[in-house]
C-alpha cells in the first residue's frame, strides 16, 4: 500500500535541506501494509473514479486522507445538519457545519504542521520524466513495478473518449498530450496493442488521424528530438548564445519571466549540443508508430512551424517566424561550424551550464518546477553521466510524485505553503482556538519554519536573481523561489498569530523577520501599483511577440496580477496596524497604489480576471478583499459597486456560483454546463461579497449561498470534489485538491462572523 511520508529526508547522501525538510511530502510503497479493509477502501476509490472518469476529471485525493484519518482514528461525532427548502437558516446550523468541517480538516494536518494535497492536472508533466530516466538508464531504479502500475493507471484513467489526451485533465485531446502519453506508455512496457481499454492503439489512432507527431507543438518537437523521434532540424533555433548577450539588451534572458528563462536555459543547452538519446529498438519502433510517413522521408525543415490545430492557443506572429527563420538559415549554420563552434558555441554552452548548476544548487535540486527539473537533470547527465550534479537531481525526483485514486502523477512542484496559509486563515476565521489550539500551533510553526532566511547564494544579481530573504515559496523552504502572494499570505498569517496567546499558538515571529517580508513586498511593487509574482516586472511588452510556445500566453516577461496585488495590500494594511512605525510612508504609498491598480484593471462588466484560479469569481474575491482592506467601500468606490453587481448578476438559482474553466482561455465569463454550482466558486464569491459589506445591504444572497454550502457537506464533514479550480498562464488548468476542503470552511466562518447571526432564525432563503 502507498504511504505518504512527511518531513523525511531519508538516507540518500545526495540530498540536503535548509530547514530539516519541513514541508517535504514523499510517497513510498509499503509492501508490509496489507490491511484488507484499507486495501478494499483504496480499490473502491479507484473503481469509483474509473467509472465516473468522464463526468468528473479531478480526483478527490483520497489515499492520503484515508491514511491520515485512519492513523489518527478520526471519527466525526458532530451530527450532520441540513437546511430544508423553506426552512430558516439558523446560527446553530452554521455553527455545526463549521465545527464539523474544522474538526475534519484539523485531522488532516501533517505532523510538521502543513496540509498535504495534490497540485497537478497537466498531462505533460510525467512523460518527460519517464523519457529522461529512460535516456539516462535510471528508469528501472526509480520506477518500481508499483510506480509503473500507478503511472499507467493515471494515463488510462485520463484518456479521453476519442482516444487522445488533453493538455490538462479537463481539456480536449491535443497532439502534445497524446504523443507524450503514448510514448510514456510504451517506455513503461506497454506493447503497440496494450493498455487498459486498448489505450495504446486508441492513442496511436488519434495521433495518425490528426496528422502524425510532426504537428506536435514546439516543446513536443524538442522532446521528440531529444528522444531521437524527430530530427533537431525540425525545431526552431534555441541558441545558447542568448546567454552571452549584453544584459542591457531588451531580449536578454535575464529580463525574461523566470519560468520562461528556466525552461529555455536547459533546452538551449541540449539544442546547442544537438543531444540525441541512444537509438534503441524501441525508439525505432516508435518512429514507425507515430509518424504518417517513413521517418527517413520526412522533410524536417517544413515541419518547424507546423502545429496541430487542437493544440494552437497562441499563434505565432509573422515577425516571430521571420526571426526563427533568420536564425535557422543564417546564424545556426555559422555557430555549428568551425571556428565559431569553438569560439562562441562552446563558451555559450559553458555559461548556460553555469547558470543551470547555480539554479539547481539554490533550489536544493528541486528547481523552479517540474518542466525545468527534468530538463536540468538531463542537461547535468549529458555534461557528466556519473557526476554529483546528476545524482543530486535523482535524489529529489520523489518530491514530484503524487499518488491518488486515479494513479501516480507528477506535481507542478507542490503547493504546501500555499495550501497551509489558506488553511490557517480558514481555521483562524472559525474562532475555535479553544478546540483546535494544537492544530493552530503546528500550522504557525510550519509557516515560520518555511520562511526563506537568505538571499540566493553568491553574487546572485549576476545570475539574474533577486532578493529572497524574508519571502515564502509556493511549496517549502528548500524550493527557494520567492513569490509575492505566498510571501504576503505568510506574512498575514504570522501577523494574525501574533495577536493570539503564545501559550496557545507558540511564540510570535520576531519583528526583524516580519520586516524582511515587508522589504520583499515593497521591492517587488511595479510603478503601476501592481504586484508581479516572482520578480520585478518592467521589461518591454513587445517581447511577448516572441512567445515561442503555442499553448501559453504572457510567458516571456513578468506581469502584474490582481491576486498578488490584493494579497500584498491586505498583508501590509494589517502590518501597518500592528507595526505603525516601520517604513510607514512606503507602506502607505504601497497600499494606495495597489488599490488604484486593482481599480484600474477592472473589466467593463465589473469583473476581474483571475490569473491563478477559475476565474472571474477568483479574481473578484481577491479584488474586493484588497479594496476593502485599503478602505474602499460600496459607498465610496465605484469599482466595489461594479464588482458586487457582477457577482450578484451571475449568482445561480440554487444560491451558488459555478464557472467553467473555459473562462480562463476565453477571457470572458463562461458558466458551467446546466448552470451547475461549484462549492469553491461559491465560497470565493460569498467571501468577496462579505468583504464588500453585502451583509449590511441585503444579506439574502449570502444566506442562499451559505445554505448551499451547509447542505453540500458530506457525512464526514468534508465537501465533495467538483470541477477543476486552478489555472496558470490562461490555458493550463491545475487541480488544487485542498481547495474543496479549505474554502467552504473559510466562507462559512466569514459568513458567521459578518452576518451577526443570533441563535434565532436569521433568514428564509429562496429555494
From Swiss-Prot:
Repeat as a keyword of this entry, yes or no, is: yes
Reported tissue expression: Expressed only in the epidermal cells on both sides of the leaf and not in internal leaf tissues.
Does the keyword rRNA-binding feature in the UniProt annotation?
Answer: no
Indicate what this protein is called per its UniProt record. Answer: Glutinol synthase
Query: Tell me, what does this protein do in biology?
Result: Oxidosqualene cyclase that generates glutinol, a triterpenoid product. Glutinol is probably required to coat the leaf exterior as a defense compound against pathogens or herbivores.
Q: Its family?
A: Belongs to the terpene cyclase/mutase family.
Q: Which residues form a coiled coil?
A: none
Per-repeat ranges for PFTB: 148-189, 640-681
Q: What is its EC number?
A: 5.4.99.49
Its BP terms in the Gene Ontology are: triterpenoid biosynthetic process
GO terms, molecular function: beta-amyrin synthase activity; intramolecular transferase activity
Catalyzed reactions per annotation: (S)-2,3-epoxysqualene = glutinol
Q: Where is the active site?
A: 485
Taxonomic lineage is: Eukaryota, Viridiplantae, Streptophyta, Embryophyta, Tracheophyta
Note the PANTHER family from the entry: TERPENE CYCLASE/MUTASE FAMILY MEMBER, TERPENE CYCLASE_MUTASE FAMILY MEMBER
Amino acid at each position: 500500500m502507498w504511504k505518504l511520508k512527511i518531513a523525511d529526508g531519508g538516507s540518500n547522501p545526495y540530498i540536503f535541506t535548509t530547514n530539516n525538510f519541513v514541508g517535504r511530502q514523499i510517497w513510498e510503497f509499503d509492501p508490509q501494509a496489507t490491511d484488507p479493509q484499507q486495501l478494499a477502501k483504496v480499490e473502491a476509490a479507484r473503481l469509483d473514479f474509473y467509472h465516473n472518469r468522464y463526468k468528473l476529471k479531478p480526483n478527490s485525493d483520497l489515499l492520503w486522507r484515508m491514511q491520515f484519518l485512519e492513523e489518527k482514528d478520526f471519527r466525526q461525532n458532530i451530527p450532520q445538519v441540513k437546511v430544508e427548502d423553506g426552512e430558516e437558516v439558523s446560527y446553530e446550523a452554521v455553527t455545526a457545519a463549521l465545527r464539523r468541517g474544522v474538526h475534519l480538516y484539523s485531522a488532516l494536518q501533517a505532523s510538521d504542521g502543513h496540509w498535504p494535497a495534490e497540485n497537478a492536472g497537466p498531462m505533460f508533466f510525467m512523460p518527460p520524466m519517464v523519457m529522461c530516466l529512460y535516456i539516462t538508464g535510471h528508469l528501472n531504479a526509480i520506477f518500481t513495478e508499483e510506480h509503473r502500475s500507478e503511472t499507467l493507471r493515471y494515463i488510462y484513467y485520463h484518456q479521453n473518449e476519442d482516444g487522445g489526451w488533453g493538455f490538462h485533465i479537463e481539456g480536449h485531446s491535443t497532439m502534445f498530450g497524446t504523443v507524450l502519453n503514448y510514448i510514456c506508455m510504451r517506455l513503461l512496457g506497454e506493447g503497440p496493442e496494450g493498455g487498459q481499454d486498448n489505450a495504446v492503439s486508441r492513442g496511436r489512432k488519434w495521433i495518425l488521424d490528426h496528422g502524425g507527431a510532426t504537428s506536435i507543438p514546439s516543446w513536443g518537437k524538442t522532446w521528440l528530438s531529444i528522444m531521437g523521434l524527430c530530427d533537431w532540424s525540425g525545431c526552431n533555433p534555441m541558441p545558447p548564445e542568448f546567454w552571452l548577450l549584453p544584459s542591457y539588451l531588451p531580449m536578454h534572458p535575464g529580463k525574461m519571466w523566470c519560468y520562461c528563462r528556466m525552461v529555455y536555459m536547459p533546452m538551449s543547452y541540449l539544442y546547442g549540443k544537438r543531444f540525441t538519446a541512444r537509438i534503441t529498438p524501441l525508439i525505432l519502433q516508435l518512429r514507425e508508430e507515430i509518424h504518417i510517413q517513413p521517418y527517413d522521408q520526412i522533410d524536417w525543415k517544413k515541419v518547424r512551424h507546423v502545429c496541430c490545430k487542437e493544440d494552437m492557443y497562441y499563434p505565432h506572429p509573422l515577425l516571430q517566424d521571420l526571426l526563427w527563420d533568420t536564425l535557422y538559415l543564417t546564424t545556426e549554420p555559422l555557430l555549428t561550424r568551425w571556428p565559431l563552434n569553438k569560439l562562441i558555441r562552446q563558451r555559450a554552452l559553458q555559461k548556460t551550464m553555469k547558470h543551470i548548476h547555480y539554479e539547481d544548487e539554490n533550489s536544493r535540486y528541486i528547481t523552479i518546477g517540474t518542466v525545468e527539473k527534468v530538463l536540468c537533470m538531463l542537461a547535468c547527465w549529458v555534461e557528466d553521466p556519473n557526476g554529483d550534479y546528476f545524482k543530486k537531481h535523482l535524489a529529489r525526483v520523489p518530491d514530484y510524485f503524487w499518488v491518488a485514486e486515479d494513479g501516480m502523477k507528477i506535481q507542478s512542484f507542490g503547493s504546501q505553503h500555499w495550501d497551509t496559509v489558506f488553511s490557517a486563515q480558514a481555521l483562524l476565521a472559525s474562532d475555535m482556538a479553544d478546540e483546535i489550539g494544537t492544530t493552530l500551533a503546528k500550522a504557525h510553526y510550519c509557516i515560520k519554519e518555511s520562511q526563506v532566511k537568505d538571499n540566493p547564494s553568491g553574487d546572485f544579481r549576476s545570475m539574474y536573481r533577486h532578493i529572497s530573504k524574508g519571502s515564502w515559496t509556493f511549496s517549502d523552504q528548500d524550493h527557494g523561489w520567492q513569490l509575492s502572494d505566498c510571501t504576503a499570505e505568510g506574512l498575514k498569517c504570522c501577523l494574525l498569530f501574533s495577536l493570539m496567546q503564545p501559550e496557545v499558538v507558540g511564540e510570535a515571529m520576531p519583528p526583524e523577520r516580519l520586516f524582511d517580508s515587508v522589504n520583499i513586498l515593497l521591492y517587488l511593487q511595479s510603478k503601476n501599483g501592481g504586484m508581479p509574482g516572482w520578480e520585478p516586472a518592467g521589461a518591454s511588452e513587445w517581447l511577448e511577440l516572441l512567445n515561442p510556445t503555442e499553448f501559453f500566453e504572457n510567458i516571456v516577461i513578468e506581469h502584474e496580477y490582481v491576486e498578488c496585488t490584493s494579497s500584498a495590500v491586505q498583508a501590509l494594511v494589517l502590518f501597518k496596524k500592528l507595526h505603525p512605525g516601520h517604513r510607514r510612508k512606503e507602506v502607505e504609498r504601497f497600499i494606495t497604489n495597489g488599490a488604484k491598480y486593482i481599480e484600474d484593471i477592472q473589466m467593463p462588466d465589473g469583473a476581474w480576471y483571475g490569473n491563478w484560479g477559475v476565474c472571474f469569481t477568483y479574481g473578484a474575491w481577491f479584488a474586493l478583499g484588497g479594496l476593502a482592506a485599503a478602505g474602499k467601500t460600496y459607498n465610496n468606490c465605484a469599482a466595489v459597486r461594479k464588482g458586487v453587481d457582477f457577482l450578484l448578476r451571475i449568482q445561480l438559482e440554487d444560491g451558488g456560483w459555478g464557472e467553467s474553466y473555459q473562462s480562463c482561455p476565453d477571457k470572458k465569463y463562461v458558466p458551467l454546463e446546466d448552470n451547475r454550482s461549484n462549492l469553491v466558486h461559491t465560497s470565493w464569491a460569498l467571501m468577496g461579497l462579505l468583504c464588500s459589506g453585502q451583509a449590511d445591504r441585503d444579506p439574502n444572497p449570502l444566506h442562499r449561498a451559505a445554505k448551499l454550502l451547509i447542505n453540500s457537506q458530506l457525512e464526514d464533514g468534508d465537501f465533495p470534489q467538483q470541477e477543476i479550480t486552478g489555472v496558470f498562464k490562461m490555458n493550463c488548468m491545475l487541480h488544487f485538491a485542498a481547495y474543496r476542503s479549505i474554502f467552504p470552511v473559510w466562507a462559512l466562518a466569514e459568513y458567521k462572523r459578518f452576518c451577526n447571526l443570533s441563535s434565532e432564525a436569521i433568514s428564509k432563503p429562496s429555494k
